[in-house]
Amino acid sequence: PKQMQWYINGKKDEGLRPQHIETYDDQTEETFVKVYQAYQEACDRAGLVDFAELLLRAHELWLNNPVLLKHYQQRFTHVLVDEFQDTNSVQYAWLTLLGKESGKVMIVGDDDQSIYGWRGAKIENIQRFTSEYEQVETIRLEQNYRSTANILNAANKLISNNNNRLGKELWTQDDAGEKISIYTAFNEIDEARFISGRIK
């Protein structure tokens, strides 16, 4: 059941209904599509929607109703999206429908903080935005107020190995702070014991 839940949610995040999914004669994929279809029919009969369905229905509504889309394009002349690194394909499509024509779009995001890929977030949306929108200005917020220099230096060194990022160099006016130490826990209980001991 959990695997099917992720499958259905993932397909909706991509803007795909069961009839849009190509199975390529893969029996597993065909089974998943049938379950997706049955799930959607059951939801429709019961008058229920999941979160991904809310997003997809709004997207389809705008795609299939140019008059309504124009109304919202005129109503929302400026669009701001925060935590942009956590957007999925349908949410990116929303942004394109609402804001691309006017070009008055501002996104705020950190491509080094994308942690919701398992939930459909596509870090590629940041790169897409910078290539698909005209006159994009990137403002890097690199000064950090929370961490010490030692932590930031280690983080910068580690994340620099990721070649699929826009790039930035975090810095702080704070002092170097404690040196970083590494503890390898045997399991989650050992990890919890170590952390609680350090906190005391």
Model-derived regions, located:
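Conserved P-loop NTPase-based nucleic-acid remodeling module centered on helicase motor cores
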Residues: P1-K12, Q19-T23, K34, Y183, ...
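Alpha-helical scaffold elements adjacent to nucleotide-binding pockets in ATP/GTP-utilizing enzyme cores
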Residues: Q3, Y7, W94-L97, N125-E132, ...
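Conserved helicase NTPase motor core
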Residues: I8, D25-R128, R140-S147
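Residue-level signal for pocket-adjacent positions within structured domains
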Residues: K11, L16, D44, D110-Q113, ...
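Proline-centered turn/helix-capping motifs that create local helix->coil transitions or kinks
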Residues: K12-P18, G103, L158-K168
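Short linear capping/connector segments at secondary-structure termini
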Residues: Q19-Y24, R75-H78, D111-D112, W171-K179
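Helicase P-loop NTPase motor core
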Residues: E134-T138, E142-K200
